[in-house]
Amino acid sequence: MTADIILRSDCIFTATGKAPFSGYVAIGGGRILDVGHGEPPVWLNGGETETVELGDRTVSPGFVDVHCFFTGWAAEKIGVDPEDVSNHPALLGNREKIEPLFREYMAMLNARGVTAVKEMGFDDFSGFAELLDEWERADELSLRVSFMSQPVGRPMDLAFGRAMQERFRGAFVRFSGFNRMTDGSISQLEGDLKQPYSCASDMTCALAIDWDAIAAEVRAADEAGFRFSLHAQGDAAIARVLDIYETCCRDESGRLVNRHAITDLEFSDPADLERMGQLGAIAEIYPQIQSIARREEKLRMIREKIGMERGRYYWNRRKMADSGVPLSCGTDLPLLIDDIPESVYCAVGGYFPEDNEPFNRQNMLTAEELMTAWTRGGAYALMRENELGTLENGKRADIAVLSGNIFTTPAEDARGLSAVLTLVDGRMVYRKEELASAARNAFAP
């Protein structure tokens, strides 16, 4: 089979563990036909094949955001309080408003190189699953959507989960399990800590968390074969979540069968990250989180709440990677809006927005590790690694192209890069104007 499109670049990142290289990615029939070094072989070139010369632009698997909240983004867009859960059914049930908003949402994410997301939906998602079903059947989705049910108005509904799992088996929409919050923000004394807050010697958490109820819910979901994501910020919360996961179904090597995850992991105990790696629990980290904080204010908060001795373990992704924790990336959108180069600035460089002085540099990832988390790690978290997440023969042609070489650009300069081309199933869903001449007729309407 000859290729429809061949992408040529001096920076091909396959996310398979190989170093980026100069080569090509050949695409045909919505799939990756071949990936290789140097020039593409003659057999790939047919009479209709278009070759796109990309120079040193990074060619990567499409990016996966494993923690998004479309409902919150839509509520903000139309001026509704996203924290008021009672607003969500009316919002999601209003087709006249929600359909154009979701199209805008997909376009926004595609323009940032994102090709797949995991969405949080309260309870039964207020009927939004029906819209996703309709759009998938009509081939109108440019974004793969796995969604989770977060019990808010009623208890976890396993019957709903089974129905959604049976209903969504296509290429674009899947049901991914259940999600729940545990503790809250350390800045509000609501993060659950192993030792008391420095500013409140008798306080380890201002919230009354029903850990027994959370454990029962997770075990019930696990026994039914569903994944669970638990949001935890403080070191005690992370430890308690791991205690729960250790009671779940595991394989012969002791790793979780249902790929449960922990979201956020702001402040952790290194010993627990080792436990996490042994369990195979997935970390859903927020690599851009420093971008919404000012250095002086954030460090003052850490100093006042837990002290800088414990503060050494803030955002400790280095220990996660070294402990074998599967890493994936999220934004808690609309808290953050996906910007992969900015995530390199923050999670590789360790920088806050206003300066180039790293914080906890010893806890940072390499650019290759972070890009792998955004791609292969995200696909693994969605249980779709057999068809997404890497540039390999036979996989779906979900591809993102960045405006430069993200691996040779210093982390402090990474914010100058951006997505210039995004493909989903080999179809162009975004192209920046600067790429028009390079692409020629390859992506003509």
What positions do the PLM features span?
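Divalent metal-binding segments
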Residues: 2-160, 176, 180, 185-237, ...
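A structural microfeature
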Residues: 33-34, 421, 430
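Short, structured coil segments at secondary-structure junctions
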Residues: 45-47, 279, 323
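Short glycine/threonine-rich loop-to-helix capping motif typified by GTGT followed
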Residues: 125-139, 269-279, 401-404
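Acidic (Asp/Glu)-rich catalytic clusters
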Residues: 135-138, 163-170, 255, 276-278
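Phosphate/diphosphate-binding loops
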Residues: 142-178, 259-270, 301-326
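His/Asp/Glu-enriched, well-ordered alpha-helical/loop segment
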Residues: 219-228, 236-260, 265, 274, ...
